[in-house]
A protein has these predicted regions:
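ER/Golgi luminal nucleotide-sugar-dependent glycosyltransferases, focusing on the catalytic module
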Residues: 23-254
């Protein structure tokens, strides 16, 4: 049986691009954080039972995407995996791309700093911690002098993304979001905004109590909406190779 295509709703119109010189490329100092979870926790499976759960399939999906980011772009890539999987399949790439490839690996269930997530069933909240942890542990982000960090869900590769970023001056951009405000496979920000956009405590902070039973997508949206519009880069819709989504189905664009 073929998985249903999950994103068949009408594509949101993209805002017209202004002041983009097609002949100019910007040297933005961007780092991509690819978030991965090979072994899903039972509490997450119970909360999202339709998600891809087979470990082998999840590994294959991640490996395919990670290799494309490495072989088909020149971007600094930080892979973060939060279930203890070490990606032995990438030993060759770790050496070949050592100047711009790094893995931050940990097991959330045994990491004391993540103990507050023990009873949390929100997949997004666990991911926010992994983004925070990856940035804190990363040596590559510091060594590459990256000042703009973009989280991309690890299973997805976006062929157009690097060229898109080159056409935009990110020096005055505080946050980057997908074309659909309530999607969060792609979320980025200037490093000065990192602790605001990707705060590890997320729903647990008093000022976000109203979001306690909501999705991380809503929190991201409201945070980015609070920033000046001229300082937010809204991405176009990116076509991607059909990829199994984390919540099931097949994703064909982001």
């Amino acid at each position: 049986n073929v998985d249903p295509v999950v994103n068949v709703d009408p594509v949101v119109n993209v805002d017209p691009v202004v002041n983009v010189d097609p002949n100019k490329n910007y040297d933005n100092k961007v780092a991509i954080i690819l978030t991965c979870t090979v072994n899903r926790q039972s509490k997450i499976v119970e909360h999202i039972p339709q998600g891809q759960s087979d470990e082998k399939e999840r590994v294959e999906t991640y490996i395919k995407s990670i290799k494309k980011w490495l072989y088909e772009t020149s971007l600094p890539i930080v892979v973060v995996e939060n279930s203890g999987y070490e990606f032995p399949e990438l030993e060759f790439e770790k050496d070949m791309f050592k100047e711009r490839f790094e893995m931050v690996l940990y097991n959330e269930t045994t990491l004391q700093e993540a103990a507050y997530l023990k009873d949390n069933h929100s997949k997004g909240t666990h991911e926010v911690f992994s983004i925070y942890y990856a940035k804190r542990q990363s040596k590559l982000i510091i060594q590459s002098a990256c000042n703009f960090i973009i989280k991309v869900t690890g299973r997805f590769y976006i062929p157009e993304f690097e060229n898109y970023l080159k056409k935009h001056d990110l020096s005055n951009i505080k946050a980057l979001r997908q074309n659909r405000a309530l999607n969060c496979q792609i979320v980025g920000c200037h490093i000065d905004q990192f602790n605001f956009i990707f705060n590890k405590r997320c729903f647990y902070r008093d000022e976000y109590a109203e979001y306690e039973n909501d999705y991380i997508e809503i929190l991201y949206k409201d945070k980015i909406d609070s920033l000046p519009n001229e300082n937010v880069l809204k991405c176009p819709v990116f076509n991607i190779e059909p990829t199994t989504g984390g919540c099931g189905g097949t994703v064909t664009y982001l």
